[in-house]
A protein has these predicted regions:
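N-terminal low-complexity segments that are often proline-rich with Ser/Thr-Pro
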Residues: 206-208
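C-terminal catalytic domain of photolyase/cryptochrome flavoproteins
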Residues: 1-204
Length: 208
């Protein structure tokens, strides 16, 4: 459940391997194809391309590296300045199992699956209505593969303030997402063990 990744991003960011090398190897293992064939490889290639795309954005639109959103009018969003809710999110104590599990894994290992990053980011910016930049800064202090361009791009996509962003009305439902990607609740129970001792299903909201 929610762990089928190559985990190469820290090595790419450190310059140990290159994006080009990854694409060459992907073609070798996929009958010389990048956009067809093995679905897992095709998806992996798309993630590498997103990484390069966000580098293009930060190079050509440097304002996104200066604490500004890509979409200008979104800088006027009246964010919720709830320091208590923000801290509970940072501590993995929101009561939403999949959100808390993702945060706790990151705090313990420096890693979080990309799908979880989107779920966690949307929960902060669209459910709690807290400025996405708070999450962007927090992720950069915790992720082992922390990368300014990808981190900024991912957060702005989730908060609907960036280029090619998710529509503002798109909000990932944490419960349905966790049921889809962690149907047995194995991942959640690993990082939020309290779930195992309640009468609730692993995907239901916990009350702290």
């Amino acid at each position: 459940a929610i762990d089928a990744t190559a985990k190469l991003s820290p090595y790419i960011n450190a310059g140990i391997v290159s994006s080009k090398w990854c694409l060459v190897k992907a073609k070798e293992f996929n009958n010389d194809m990048l956009d067809d064939g093995d679905k897992g490889i095709v998806h992996w290639v798309s993630e590498i391309l997103w990484r390069e795309f966000y580098r293009h954005i930060i190079y050509n639109f440097p304002k996104v590296s200066k604490n500004l959103p890509f979409i200008d009018y979104t800088k006027n969003i009246p964010w919720n300045e709830d320091s208590v809710a923000l801290q509970r999110w940072k501590d993995g104590k929101t009561g939403i199992p999949i959100v808390d599990a993702g945060i706790r894994e990151m705090l313990a290992t420096g890693w979080m699956h990309n799908r979880l990053r989107m779920i966690v980011a949307m929960f902060l910016s669209k459910n709690l209505l807290i400025n996405w930049q708070e999450g962007e800064k927090f992720f950069m202090t915790k992720l082992i593969d922390g990368d300014i361009a990808s981190n900024n791009g991912g957060w702005q996509w989730s908060a609907s303030t960036g280029t090619d962003a998710a529509p503002y009305f798109r909000i990932m439902n944490p419960e349905t997402q966790s049921i889809k990607f962690d149907p047995e609740g194995e991942y959640i129970k690993k990082w939020v063990p309290a779930v195992s001792y309640t009468h609730l299903r692993a995907h239901e909201t916990l009350n702290h």
